[in-house]
């Protein structure tokens, strides 16, 4: 394959693998705990951090990470209050992040920034720094889930039972929300804000067609996610279409085929 000779494509392949590992692990918790809507809110809230980074002249990804983690904590805290419904808390941070992102990006000095890279992503432009961030996150998630897999499963499936077992549920919930936020930000370069949530849900939905085991869903999700990324890259190359959209298209196609097979 001639493509494999290019550094940018090698980076894209490695980024796909690392992102598939990170998304496969934390995405299984998201789908099991039914946090898809919350994750979507955090994804769009990260746009506020991107705008702030562009305005302040710092790394947009770094500021997006901080903003996303704080938004995740805010959603978690507000959703536990009796005077605030969870969907309302999500809507607050979702719209606040988007509004701040637009405002700060237009107030940024110099030429108007190109926001399409953050909204829609391009896996072919990921850098060594992005790979290091993804690799570090994947390693941390592997270690964390290996050490605390049973408490995480208890929290994911039955919060009340986890509390009765003396598990510090609130601590795990906040830590996992932080990992969700960091994983979302790490994938922005690949598929962008608009499509990032798909990497955290579609492979898990596909895996769930074949097994209900939490651990097996993780393993299958990683493989399915990587397959979707590979397919998306080649579709993008041959059809000359955006890589982020191609990855999601192939992932949904895989889900549809598996759904038909399992009928």
For each of these PLM feature ranges, what is it?
Residues 190, 194-245:
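Transmembrane alpha-helical segments in multi-pass inner-membrane proteins
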Residues 241-248, 252-263:
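Cytosolic-side transmembrane-helix boundaries in multi-pass membrane proteins
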């Amino acid at each position: 394959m001639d493509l494999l000779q290019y550094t940018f494509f090698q980076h894209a392949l490695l980024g796909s693998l690392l992102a598939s590992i990170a998304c496969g692990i934390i995405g299984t918790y998201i789908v099991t705990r039914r946090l898809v809507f919350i994750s979507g809110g955090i994804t769009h809230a990260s746009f506020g951090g991107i705008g702030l980074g562009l305005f302040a002249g710092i790394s947009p990804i770094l500021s997006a990470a901080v903003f996303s983690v704080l938004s995740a904590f805010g959603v978690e805290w507000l959703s536990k209050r009796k005077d605030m419904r969870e969907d309302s808390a999500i809507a607050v941070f979702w719209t606040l992040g988007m509004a701040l992102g637009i405002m700060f990006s237009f107030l940024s000095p110099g030429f108007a920034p190109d926001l399409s890279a953050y909204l829609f992503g391009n896996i072919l432009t990921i850098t060594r720094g992005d790979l290091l961030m993804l690799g570090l996150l994947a390693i941390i998630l592997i270690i964390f889930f290996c050490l605390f897999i049973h408490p995480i499963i208890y929290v994911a499936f039955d919060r009340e039972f986890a509390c009765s077992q003396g598990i510090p549920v609130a601590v795990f919930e906040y830590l996992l929300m932080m990992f969700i936020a960091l994983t979302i930000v790490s994938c922005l370069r690949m598929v962008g804000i608009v499509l990032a949530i798909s990497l955290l849900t579609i492979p898990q939905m596909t895996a769930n067609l074949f097994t209900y085991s939490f651990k097996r869903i993780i393993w299958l999700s990683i493989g399915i996610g990587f397959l979707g990324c590979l397919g998306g890259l080649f579709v993008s190359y041959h059809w000359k279409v955006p890589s982020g959209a191609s990855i999601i298209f192939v992932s949904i196609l895989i889900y549809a085929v598996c759904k038909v097979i399992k009928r």
